[in-house]
Amino acid sequence: GPTGICTLLCVMLKNPKHIIMCEKDEERIQFINKHYPDVLTVSPEECEEFVKKTSDHGGADVVLEVAGAESTFRLAWECARPNAIVTIVALYDKAQSLPLPDMYGKNLIFKIGGVDGCDCDETLKLIADGKINTEPLITHTYPLSKIEEAYDLFENKRDGVIKVAVECWH
């Protein structure tokens, strides 16, 4: 979704050798392929095997988990190579458990936390300087008078919506 794509934009600033994005929604896959053609997309079912085959060390050096489901949490650490970093961007509805016997020998580093407000100035500067282009994320625009319609579109994920901009000056 939008958080995953924004995370992708930040990852792209680091120019990694490969970026692999695991996505199950076909509209989002098309969006990613259209706007970010260097990003490799893969389905959740094929992700672990694809990551291991594509990477140099039998797994990803860094994994960012953005979806927030129990299955995606597990997939994140399973795709990580030994001694990798797994960053949790997602917010979960319930506590996740670390199946330590399954993880034994991976020596993973987990980084967990929400949005850090102290980085907002840097993020806005990156956008203003054109280093992060968020314009493709705004797929729909509505006047303030139609805010309920805009929210309904976004909430129900219709018409390929990623983000909705609301114009307040109409």
Question: How would you label these PLM feature ranges?
Answer:
Residues 2-3, 11:
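Hydrophobic/small residue at the entry helix of a nucleotide-binding pocket
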Residues 8, 29, 73-77, 100:
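Generic hydrophobic/aromatic pocket-lining and core-packing "Φ" positions
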Residues 12-73:
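Adenosine-nucleotide cofactor-binding segment
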Residues 55, 68, 81-82, 159:
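Short conserved AdoMet
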Residues 74-78, 117-170:
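C-terminal hydrophobic helical "lid"/dimerization subdomain
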Residues 85-87, 98-137:
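Rossmann-fold dehydrogenase core element
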